[in-house]
Amino acid sequence: MEKPKIQEVIAVEGRYDKNALLQVVDASVLELGGFGIFNDREKTALLRRLAETRGIILFTDPDGAGFVIRNRLKGAIPTGRVLHAYVPDVYGKEKRKRRAGKEGKLGVEGMPPEVLLSALRAAGATFEGEGATVKENPVTHADLLDLGLIGAGSRTKRAALLRALALPEHLSTAALLDVLGTLTTREELVEECNKIVANRE
């Protein structure tokens, strides 16, 4: 089976993440070297250039460290096309490791191929030979407020939504809004929230 080809460059934390992705897609994958990216000015400059020319997809682990790396890079790459791919919170350990990570979550390398592909599609990756899909009625900040996903008393409902959409728990409001913009429409989000409310009753 031929692997789908992606236009953007995918930036991952390490070599095992890179290997996992290259088994699923035909793409340029750049290793960040974990926290080492913070001191690597040349690689950061390369990421800026790639964001301007081809676009990049930040694909870090769903743990706290992955979000620190993602957020630091988001600030370091102010312009260009920067997409964010997320894998769900799945607890366990990768086969090559003796024990689970600090938070006990699987990283990019531990995810099944279909989860990786789904995360890339949800991020808005450009797949060669496929037309771009534009969602009508995108989700807005006001929608999140109206649906009780942000603001006072929103924690439980928001956590349930993140689980239902297979998104990591560390997602900020801005990141959630970005993801929902490519993943769902306003109507689909309302429907999902209604299911969550029905399941709690």
Language-model segment annotations:
Residues 11-13, 51-65, 86:
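Acidic beta-strand-to-loop metal/phosphate-binding motif
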Residues 1-10:
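A short, flexible N-terminal coil/short beta segment enriched in small residues
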Residues 16, 33-35, 61-63, 85-92:
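Short, ordered loop/turn segments at secondary-structure junctions
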Residues 118-121, 125, 130-201:
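C-terminal, charge/polar-rich interaction regions
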Residues 36-39, 59-69:
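Acidic, metal-coordinating catalytic cores used for nucleic-acid/nucleotide bond scission
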Residues 8-9, 15-19, 23-53:
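Acidic, glycine-rich catalytic loops of TOPRIM or P-loop NTPase phosphate-binding modules used
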Residues 75-126:
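Long, charge-dense
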